[in-house]
C-alpha cells in the first residue's frame, strides 16, 4: 500500500471522530457546567456527551466500513473495530485535554489554539491505538505535517455549512 494512502487510511477513524461532534453534539456538557479550582469551566459547553459518544461511534463505524472495503488491511473485523475504537476514543480524549488546557489559559470557546487543536487529537489517537496497531514513523511525521492543513480545511467547510460559528 502507498505510504501516503496508508497514513490517511489508518487515521481516518480519528479524523471522522474528531469532526463528528460539530454535527452530532449538543446537549449536556461533559463537565456538567462545573468549574475547576481556578473558577473557570473544566471543558466548557462545546464538549458534550452526545458529541463525545457520537464521535466515537462514527469513528468506529468508519473503521468497520474500512475493513469491509479492504479486509486485508486489518486482517480481522475484531482488530479493525478495536483500532478504530481506540483511534476515535484517543482523538476525543486528546480534544478534551486541549479544551481543558485552553480553559486554564482563559481562551474562550472556539478560540484557535494553533498546534493544540490540530496535533492534540492526532497524537492522543496514535497513542491510544498503539497497543493494537501502529504505522511507520515516516507516516506519523507525514500526518503531523498534513493534519493542520486538513483541520483548517475541515473547519472552513463546517463554517460554510453553518455547522460552526467561526472558520477555525
UniProtKB/Swiss-Prot annotation:
One of its GO terms (biological process) is glycerophospholipid biosynthetic process. Its main location: membrane. It is a multi-pass membrane protein. Keywords: Cell membrane, Lipid biosynthesis, Lipid metabolism, Magnesium, Membrane, Phospholipid biosynthesis, Phospholipid metabolism, Transferase, Transmembrane, Transmembrane helix. The chain crosses the membrane at residues 4-24, 51-71, 81-101, 112-132, 138-158. One of its GO terms (cellular component) is plasma membrane. InterPro entries: CarS (IPR032690), CarS_archaea (IPR002726). It holds the Pfam family CarS-like. It is an enzyme of class 2 (transferase). GO terms for molecular function: CDP-2,3-bis-(O-geranylgeranyl)-sn-glycerol synthase activity. Its EC number is 2.7.7.67. Pathway: Membrane lipid metabolism; glycerophospholipid metabolism. It catalyses: 2,3-bis-O-(geranylgeranyl)-sn-glycerol 1-phosphate + CTP + H(+) = CDP-2,3-bis-O-(geranylgeranyl)-sn-glycerol + diphosphate. It is found in: Cell membrane. Catalyzes the formation of CDP-2,3-bis-(O-geranylgeranyl)-sn-glycerol (CDP-archaeol) from 2,3-bis-(O-geranylgeranyl)-sn-glycerol 1-phosphate (DGGGP) and CTP. This reaction is the third ether-bond-formation step in the biosynthesis of archaeal membrane lipids. NCBIfam families: PRK04032.1. PANTHER family: CDP-ARCHAEOL SYNTHASE. Belongs to the CDP-archaeol synthase family. This is CDP-archaeol synthase.
